[in-house]
């Protein structure tokens, strides 16, 4: 066999091997391409998108739930079926007295509950009214014994204040069998109640509410429509605490106040200890 034929056969053999490798490479590229196409198609399919959406929704729900638990004692709006609930807490100070029954009648006719911050002496003198209030689902809050500014605030400490509220608490407990812990300071909590004073109130086991809307009803005997105007001008937030009093003019305008608040999309609630939120002028989270 001459050298030329050997070289020729060797060259042809190398070409065949090279072509074989190229063919195998092309086959592998085709297989990879088919796999990528199938994967992309699957990712773009409805089932995969639904799964991705579900994962995201689960994450969002968990995130919102975590935020909700952290803000439970704050003034965050309550949610119902994914919508913000607008809630008004009607509160009445200084009773019970001759006008309290009128207020209770109106609220009963409207199927709404409120919160009554009572003076201990008035509660002692009107036990049947206190019983009715409690039995009809209203919260029996406390408003001191005397409402005396000098006695409550000018003694140099919290002692007189706390003793008056403890006495009022005992009176309501004796009448209803329930020991209320929510109080409202006469004349409001600021500026007369400082940080240490507030700490003493919290240590005595009380929570304290001021208000977000002042109806100034005490200023308008004979002019109840002015009370409605005050409420209308101040009703802006999703949660409002309205300050009123057990007065004749308040009873005269209460139905119109209720009608207006409802027309703005609000519901009514009484205070519930297990749904407490901060509503004091200093935003003290202890109270």
Task: Give the ranges of each region predicted by the language model.
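Active-site beta->alpha N-cap acidic-glycine motif
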Residues: 59-174, 178-179, 260, 267, ...
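Catalytic domains of cell-wall/extracellular-matrix polysaccharide-remodeling enzymes
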Residues: 124-125, 145-269, 274, 281-287
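A near-ubiquitous, low-amplitude feature marking generic local secondary-structure context
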Residues: 23, 75, 86, 90, ...
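N-terminal pre-catalytic segment of deacetylase/amide-hydrolase enzymes
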Residues: 2-90, 96-109, 225-226, 260, ...
């Amino acid at each position: 066999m001459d050298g030329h034929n050997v070289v020729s056969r060797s060259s042809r053999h190398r070409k065949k091997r090279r072509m074989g490798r190229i063919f195998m490479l092309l086959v592998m590229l085709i297989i990879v391409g088919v796999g990528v196409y199938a994967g992309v198609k699957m990712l773009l399919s409805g089932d995969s998108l639904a799964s991705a959406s579900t994962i995201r929704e689960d994450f969002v729900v968990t995130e919102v739930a975590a935020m909700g638990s952290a803000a439970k004692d704050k003034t965050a709006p309550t949610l119902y079926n994914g919508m913000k609930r607008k809630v008004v807490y009607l509160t009445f100070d200084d009773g019970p007295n001759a006008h309290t029954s009128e207020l209770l009648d109106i609220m009963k006719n409207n199927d709404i509950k409120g919160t009554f911050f009572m003076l201990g002496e008035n509660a002692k003198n009107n036990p049947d009214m206190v019983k009715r209030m409690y039995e009809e689902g209203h919260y029996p809050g406390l408003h001191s014994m005397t409402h005396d500014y000098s006695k409550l605030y000018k003694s140099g400490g919290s002692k007189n204040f706390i003793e008056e509220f403890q006495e009022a608490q005992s009176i309501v407990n004796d009448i209803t069998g329930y020991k209320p812990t929510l109080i409202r300071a006469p004349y409001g909590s600021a500026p007369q109640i400082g940080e240490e004073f507030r700490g003493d109130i919290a240590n005595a086991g009380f929570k304290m509410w001021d208000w977000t809307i002042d109806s100034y009803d005490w200023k308008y005997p004979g002019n109840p429509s002015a009370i409605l105007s005050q409420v209308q001008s101040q009703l802006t937030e999703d949660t409002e605490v309205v300050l009123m009093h057990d007065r004749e003019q308040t009873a005269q305008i209460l139905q119109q106040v209720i009608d207006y608040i409802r027309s703005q999309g609000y519901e009514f609630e009484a205070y519930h200890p297990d749904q407490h939120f901060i509503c004091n002028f200093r935003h003290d989270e202890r109270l």
